[in-house]
């Protein structure tokens, strides 16, 4: 290999502001051109330290994300201005993949049987780091994962383009109902069997769940908020390779021969009947054990395990293979709109299900070491949110989020977005994302979890920092006061009375300047007891 000698320097104030959590670390610079630096990023680069006699003191791998951003996103018409993915043009289809550290990229095509039929080398634009392939319109509906033009008429339910979306004047007027697409109907016998647990359950206006929603709308409900509905990593979309409560013991044992029920229960018995046979009081461990034995093969998940961020979950479609999920998710949203509700989507950009070479890793295989947040000392991926954390401060991760949100808002008509662990991003990032979405949907509403994890020296999207931005944050003041139950105590105590004050403050919008007489008889601004908002929105 080759070596470049580095000299120790002081970071500029601008550089320190860009990476405040690195501002006090040693900094070095070398003499090489941007083209040479781009070639270094394609190699296995290592930083080594030598003593005066040339003896190696130590070596470490390098976190390259800041260098990648500097080389590929600081100019005009480079990576962060590029149109990525499959782009349909008048004459054909252009495939654009941002992979600046890749040495070569090929586009592989497959037939309906998932057998590779062709492989085409892609060309690199060295300015942007984008690899491109120009193909004809004959690529449409072929598989690389799948070429799909979301503007095609056969992917739209009848009336999709012209149906009316309800509006609300102020975000303070929103009444939001949280629901899980599968749970909404999967056990409901008034829903057609083929639609239970599916997007299309929302189109059956006569079903009990939809009648329930209609009644709520009559009484002021404005939003139906669906838990994550993009492609999940841990739900098997092929129902022949998964089980639910209507499946038999034999179905489970075909997938998991180690399950204890395989030797204990009738093979033809439904899993529901096996659960029903257990005494919940005398033998709760049996139900717990069966639940655990089903866990790897059942069809339920909340959805906080993102696999493909920009594709509807296939297990909610009547046909998981192909484009059916696109049309049926749209039909769900159209039906909810026509019932009088706006639709909010839970988005989970703060982590991925996997990284590295794991089978469910995606982003980290395209640009290794870029999309995730890394510990500055150990170099390991940070897992503060639960799993493999992403790094929204990296410019192309923010662009990925922006492109994704605009797609969900325009192509599926989601009217609001709820951000899981929103505080992992910066305040500025969230405001830029909101601006991009409002450019295509002016009354879209953002809200999310503003819990602070680790303070990294920049302005994170926390409850306090987001006050007054019109981006809402979850209120744990009233949540904890109610959940902990002290407000219902029959024994008077300072903690129970203080919890009641938190409820009162929350009912007034958790405003910082609202004057509340507390349980001690003292009137003061609620900022003294945890109020953080400057606007109830």
Language-model regions: role of each:
Residues 434-436, 440-537:
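Conserved alpha/beta catalytic core and glycan-binding cleft of carbohydrate-active enzymes
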Residues 98-105:
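Short proline/glycine-enriched turn/loop motifs at strand-loop junctions of beta-rich domains
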Residues 5-90, 123, 128, 134-178, ...:
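The feature marks proteins involved in alpha-glucan
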Residues 91-96:
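Structural beta-strand segments of beta-rich domains
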Residues 416-422:
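Short catalytic-loop micro-motif centered on adjacent basic/acidic residues
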Residues 182-187, 191-200, 214-222, 227-412, ...:
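Substrate-binding/active-site clefts of carbohydrate-active enzymes
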Residues 422-428:
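Acidic-and-aromatic substrate-binding clefts and catalytic sites of carbohydrate-active enzymes
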């Amino acid at each position: 290999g080759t070596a470049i000698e580095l000299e120790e320097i002081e970071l500029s104030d601008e550089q320190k502001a860009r990476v405040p959590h690195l501002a006090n670390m040693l900094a070095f610079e070398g003499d090489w051109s941007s083209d040479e630096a781009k070639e270094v990023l394609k190699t296995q680069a290592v930083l080594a330290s030598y003593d005066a006699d040339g003896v190696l003191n130590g070596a470490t791998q390098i976190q390259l994300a800041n260098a990648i951003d500097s080389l590929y996103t600081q100019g005009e018409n480079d990576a962060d201005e590029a149109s990525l993915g499959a782009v349909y043009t008048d004459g054909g289809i252009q495939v654009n993949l941002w992979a600046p550290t890749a040495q070569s990229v090929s586009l592989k095509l497959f037939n309906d049987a998932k057998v590779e039929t062709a492989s085409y080398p892609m060309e690199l634009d060295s300015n942007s780091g984008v690899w491109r392939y120009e193909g004809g319109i004959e690529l449409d509906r072929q598989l690389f994962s799948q070429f799909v033009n979301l503007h095609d008429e056969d992917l739209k339910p009848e009336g999709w383009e012209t149906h009316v979306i309800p509006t609300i004047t102020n975000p303070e007027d929103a009444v939001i109902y949280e629901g899980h697409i599968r749970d909404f109907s999967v056990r409901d016998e008034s829903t057609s069997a083929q639609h239970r647990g599916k997007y299309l359950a929302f189109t059956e206006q006569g079903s009990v769940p939809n009648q329930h929603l209609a009644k709520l709308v009559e009484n002021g409900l404005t939003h139906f908020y669906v838990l994550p509905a993009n492609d999940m990593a841990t739900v098997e979309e092929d129902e022949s390779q998964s089980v639910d409560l209507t499946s038999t013991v034999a179905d489970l044992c075909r997938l998991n021969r180690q399950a204890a029920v395989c030797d204990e229960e009738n093979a033809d018995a439904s899993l529901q009947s096996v659960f029903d046979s257990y005494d919940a009081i005398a033998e709760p461990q049996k139900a717990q054990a069966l639940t655990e034995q089903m866990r790897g093969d059942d069809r339920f998940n909340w959805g906080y395990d993102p696999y493909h961020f920009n594709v509807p979950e296939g297990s909610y479609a009547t046909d998981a293979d192909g484009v059916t999920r696109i049309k049926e998710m749209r039909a769900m949203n159209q039906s909810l709109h026509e019932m009088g509700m706006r639709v909010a989507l839970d988005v989970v950009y703060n982590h991925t299900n996997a990284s590295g070479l794991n089978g469910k890793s995606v982003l980290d295989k395209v640009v290794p070491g870029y999309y995730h947040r890394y510990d500055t000392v150990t170099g390991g991926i940070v897992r503060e949110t639960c799993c493999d954390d992403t790094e929204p401060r990296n410019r192309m991760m923010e662009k990925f989020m922006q492109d994704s949100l605009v797609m969900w808002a325009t192509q599926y008509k989601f009217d609001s977005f709820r951000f899981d662990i929103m505080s992992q991003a910066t305040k500025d990032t969230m405001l830029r994302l909101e601006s991009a979405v409002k450019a295509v949907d002016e009354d879209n509403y953002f809200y999310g979890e503003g819990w602070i994890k680790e303070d990294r020296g920049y302005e994170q999207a926390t409850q306090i920092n987001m006050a007054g931005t019109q981006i809402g944050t979850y209120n744990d003041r009233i949540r904890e006061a109610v959940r902990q139950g002290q407000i219902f105590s029959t024994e008077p105590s300072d903690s129970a009375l203080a919890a009641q004050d938190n409820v009162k403050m929350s009912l007034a919008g958790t405003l910082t300047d609202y004057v509340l007489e507390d349980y001690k008889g003292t009137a003061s601004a609620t900022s003294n007891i945890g109020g953080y908002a400057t606007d109830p929105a």
